[in-house]
Amino acid sequence: LRGRAIPASSACTAGSQAIGYAWEAIRHGYQTVMVAGGAEELCPSEAAVFDTLFATSQRNDEPKTTPSPFDTQRDGLVIGEGAGTLILEELEHAKARGATIYGEIVGFATNCDAAHITQPQRETMQICMEQSLAMAGLSALDMGYISAHGTATDRGDIAESQATAAIYGDNVPISSLKSYFGHTLGACGALEAWMSLQMMREGWFAPTLNLRQPDEQCGALDYIMGEARQIDCEYLQSNNFAFGGINTSIIIKRWA
């Protein structure tokens, strides 16, 4: 805890950037162990900002029906709160102390649209995902599951799904975990990476809640809908995209 402190304050990508920066520090020999993650407390003023941007769902009287990422009837995000941390560690150090190893991060990328603060750019999202694949030495054919950012906003879902489809087509199962607990902003990258890893370990992947009819403007993907799916895979990709045009992509390998 007395080593490097790398604050990540990039809204919806803060948690995933923290994990990625910690991984890079260990990979380059600057650290042996790092605690990485994100946290977000539900704040009225924060909710007001999203309301002002017309980004939040209006289904206050039907909370079980929202958010509905990628659905043709989606009407915005639902703000959540939470926290999640991962212990990242150099492999030999973890083995030497007898640590339980859950998975291996093999790829990470982050970039910036350098365009508009609230209008995501599909092309830059795609580049970020491709860069994480290249870092991991993988191709699209190697991926077994994708954890989508999937906020249920109009432009965000369209841009993300189109970028994902440009790489994977409809060959890789994908779902949005925000449909269960809302958008936890700075925490979502850490929470979703951990949950996705646990699903891969169990071979059970949750569907996107409230997704019944994918929007035709969204990319043609293999959306997990209705029921969970049993998938035996070796790699997953966890993607997050933030206001400000910040993009992140993490690839995790199942530990045998």
Feature map (PLM): residue ranges:
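Active-site-adjacent elements of ketosynthase-type condensing enzymes
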Residues: 41-67, 110-127, 151-163, 187, ...
